[in-house]
Swiss-Prot record:
It is found in: Cytoplasm. This is 2-dehydro-3-deoxyphosphooctonate aldolase. Its EC number is 2.5.1.55. Pfam families: DAHP_synth_1. It comes from the Bacteria. One of its GO terms (cellular component) is cytoplasm. HAMAP family: KDO8P_synth. One of its GO terms (molecular function) is 3-deoxy-8-phosphooctulonate synthase activity. It catalyses: D-arabinose 5-phosphate + phosphoenolpyruvate + H2O = 3-deoxy-alpha-D-manno-2-octulosonate-8-phosphate + phosphate. GO terms for biological process: keto-3-deoxy-D-manno-octulosonic acid biosynthetic process. InterPro entries: Aldolase_TIM, DAHP1/KDSA, KDO8P_synthase. Pathway: Carbohydrate biosynthesis; 3-deoxy-D-manno-octulosonate biosynthesis; 3-deoxy-D-manno-octulosonate from D-ribulose 5-phosphate: step 2/3; Bacterial outer membrane biogenesis; lipopolysaccharide biosynthesis. Belongs to the KdsA family. The lineage of its organism: Bacteria, Pseudomonadati, Pseudomonadota, Alphaproteobacteria, Hyphomicrobiales. The gene is kdsA.
Length: 282
């Protein structure tokens, strides 16, 4: 089994480059049980009203923070209980990122998608361990890699027996503390056969741009998301928060949840136009 599935189903949510757009959306990290439930409830209500499928995302450990003093999250043990309760309460599929082989095994029982962070996307043992859990795998493209380099990364998962894998574009290093989004990477990675996701919030990040933390340019999230959907992708990855300027991590990139519904509606309109055009000329 070495070919990826062109369509990946996560619960009731379908990710395919030719199917209607789906979302991966949630706060950067689990700040508390109450905050996780508040955000989850609001996101689900917005997505249900818009009529779009989504996977809820949140991190239990931000292991690659800029400085040692930065808030990393609540940790794996507490997160496992919260993820289980979120799924029981709301019924949606859940994504979280993993950093070690041991974490893959520990968290795979309560989440549906294991995400490989961009900085770790070439770590063979991590990819193989994630693949063997049977969860869907979402691999962030390293900021240091060309899009065609991701074909070998993809094969590490599929050749380990897991065809349910997605590739995620999140920007490319462009000098110091800057990322740019090369939209050519989306069709290039799509050509490998797997669904492609565009991370619209981390793509505007300024890594280490504030000295002891990362900055970001939130005002460009919508612009880049529209561009990616116009190219044609399976899904958009968005981080959101009720008060991003005071969030413990990635606040400069996250969109305010009050603006989420409007953005989703815009992206769905772009997606309908794009997919109709692609299907006409297929």
């Amino acid at each position: 089994m070495s070919q990826p599935n062109v369509s990946v189903k996560v619960g009731n949510v379908v990710f395919s480059n030719k199917a209607p757009l789906s979302l991966i959306v949630g706060p950067c990290q689990i700040e508390s049980r109450d905050h996780a439930f508040e955000m989850a409830g609001r996101i689900k209500a917005i997505a249900d009203q818009a009529g779009i499928g989504f996977v809820y995302k949140s991190s239990y450990d931000k292991a690659n923070r800029t400085s040692l003093s930065a808030a990393r999250g609540i940790g794996l043990e507490k997160a496992i209980a919260i993820f289980a309760d979120l799924k029981k309460e709301f019924g949606f599929p859940i994504l979280t990122d993993v950093h070690t082989e041991e974490q893959c095994r520990a968290v795979s029982s309560v989440v549906d998608v294991l995400q490989i962070p961009a900085f770790l996307c070439r770590q063979t043992d991590l990819l193989v361990a994630a693949a063997k859990t049977g969860c869907v795998i979402n691999i962030k493209k390293g900021q240091f890699l060309a899009p065609w380099d991701m074909e070998n990364v993809l094969k590490k998962v599929t050749q380990s027996g897991n065809p349910d894998v997605m590739l995620c574009e999140r920007g490319t290093s462009f000098g110091y503390n800057r990322l740019v989004s090369d939209m050519r990477s989306l069709p290039i990675m799509s050509s490998f056969g797997a669904p492609v996701i565009f991370d619209a919030t981390h793509s505007v990040q300024e890594p280490g741009g504030k000295g002891d933390s990362s900055g970001g340019q939130r005002q460009f999230v919508e612009i880049l998301a529209r561009a990616a959907v116009a190219v044609g992708v399976a899904g958009i990855f968005l981080e959101t928060h009720q008060d991003p300027d005071n969030a413990p991590s990635d606040g400069a990139n996250m969109i305010e949840i009050d603006n989420l519904q409007r953005l989703i509606e815009i992206l769905m309109n772009f997606d309908r136009l794009t997919k109709n055009e692609l299907n006409i000329h297929a």
